[in-house]
């Protein structure tokens, strides 16, 4: 694997035998840089605003939305917090989205998943104004991504790209294996890696739950991006020496002392062979939140026709 140990703008590695890619540090640097972009927009008379809509009783979702609001406050983005009873009819959520679409003071809309069973997630995503779709999941934005003309990149894959760039990991010509085929991570990640752009130009193999002999694919990889949502499915025996491992998974598993968070990669054994690896937590997760801010700032710049530089 071609791995460059050059100091980058967002310094994120520690000089040990295996490089630990610190997403918390990179995300903090991006948030710091976004403040100047937000200030430039505010000086034109507009404050960027993100509206979040929560329609579930999941404590983890509630905590995650709260963290997003804290991030917004840090960089100067205003927020609007909307909570809908999970038992309410789907029409109430649809009407809320329609109202936010029509509100010119709202620049980004995020509907927190999961949604109740009686609400069609696809219809909700289609209903959001594509220019306010800061998750990047509207069919129009998905199409633009596939065409190589993205308006908003989905936050987790975009965050992974930023990590690869920050760690000076060479993707051009690399064999990259993406494990997982979700619309949120796996599919857009594979698309971004093959594009003619920074953190692109890789040769990509997509694997999933029906892939035969997964280990044979991962052992041939220069870069592994594990996003299947299966606790510790990848261990050191499944990777070759010198591989870069990006662990997207965040799974709560029961232990003798209660529970703990683990990734899709068994960290200890993988770290012994990897050139670089992300921790869980503290790797990809903070980057996902940072790129939501990034997309919201970009959405505001588009809405106000303001020229800004994004980190």
Curated annotation (Swiss-Prot):
One of its GO terms (biological process) is methionine biosynthetic process. It comes from the Archaea. Pfam families: THF_DHG_CYH, THF_DHG_CYH_C. NADP(+) binds at residues 180-182, 209, 250. The keyword Acetylation does not apply. Gene3D superfamilies: Leucine Dehydrogenase, chain A, domain 1, NAD(P)-binding Rossmann-like Domain. GO terms for molecular function: methenyltetrahydrofolate cyclohydrolase activity; methylenetetrahydrofolate dehydrogenase (NADP+) activity. It catalyses: (6R)-5,10-methylene-5,6,7,8-tetrahydrofolate + NADP(+) = (6R)-5,10-methenyltetrahydrofolate + NADPH; (6R)-5,10-methenyltetrahydrofolate + H2O = (6R)-10-formyltetrahydrofolate + H(+). The keyword Lipid metabolism does not apply. Keywords: Amino-acid biosynthesis, Histidine biosynthesis, Hydrolase, Methionine biosynthesis, Multifunctional enzyme, NADP, One-carbon metabolism, Oxidoreductase, Purine biosynthesis. Pathway: One-carbon metabolism; tetrahydrofolate interconversion. Its EC number is 1.5.1.5, 3.5.4.9. InterPro entries: Aminoacid_DH-like_N_sf (IPR046346), NAD(P)-bd_dom_sf (IPR036291), THF_DH/CycHdrlase (IPR000672), THF_DH/CycHdrlase_cat_dom (IPR020630), THF_DH/CycHdrlase_NAD-bd_dom (IPR020631). Catalyzes the oxidation of 5,10-methylenetetrahydrofolate to 5,10-methenyltetrahydrofolate and then the hydrolysis of 5,10-methenyltetrahydrofolate to 10-formyltetrahydrofolate. Belongs to the tetrahydrofolate dehydrogenase/cyclohydrolase family. Homodimer. This is Bifunctional protein FolD. The gene is folD.
């Amino acid at each position: 694997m071609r791995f460059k140990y050059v100091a980058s703008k967002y310094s994120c590695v520690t000089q040990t035998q295996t490089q630990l890619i610190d997403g918390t540090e990179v995300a903090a640097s991006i948030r710091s840089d976004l403040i100047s972009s937000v200030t430039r927009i505010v000086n034109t008379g507009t404050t960027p605003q993100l509206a979040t809509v929560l329609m579930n009783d999941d404590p983890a979702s509630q905590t995650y939305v709260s963290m997003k609001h804290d991030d917004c406050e840090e960089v100067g983005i205003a927020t609007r917090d909307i909570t809908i009873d999970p038992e309410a009819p789907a029409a109430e959520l649809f009407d809320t989205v329609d109202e936010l679409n029509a509100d010119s003071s709202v620049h980004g809309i995020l509907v927190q998943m999961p949604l109740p069973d009686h609400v069609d997630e696809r219809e909700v995503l289609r209903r959001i104004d594509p220019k306010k779709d800061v998750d990047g999941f509207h069919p129009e934005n998905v199409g633009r991504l596939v065409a190589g003309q993205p308006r908003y990149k989905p936050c987790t894959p975009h965050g992974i790209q930023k990590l690869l760039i920050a760690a000076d990991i060479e993707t051009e010509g690399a064999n990259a294996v993406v494990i997982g085929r979700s619309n949120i991570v796996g599919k857009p990640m594979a698309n971004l890696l093959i594009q003619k752009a920074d953190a692109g130009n890789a040769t990509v193999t997509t694997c999933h739950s029906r892939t035969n002999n997964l280990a044979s694919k991962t052992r041939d990889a220069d870069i592994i991006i594990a996003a299947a949502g299966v606790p510790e499915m990848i261990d050191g025996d499944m990777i070759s020496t010198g591989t870069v491992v990006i662990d997207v998974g965040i799974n709560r598993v029961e232990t003798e002392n209660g529970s703990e968070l683990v990734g899709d990669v068994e960290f200890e054994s993988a770290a012994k062979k990897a050139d670089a690896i992300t921790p869980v937590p503290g790797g990809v997760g903070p980057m996902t939140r940072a790129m939501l801010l990034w997309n919201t700032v970009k959405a505001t710049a588009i809405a106000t026709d303001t020229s800004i530089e994004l980190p």
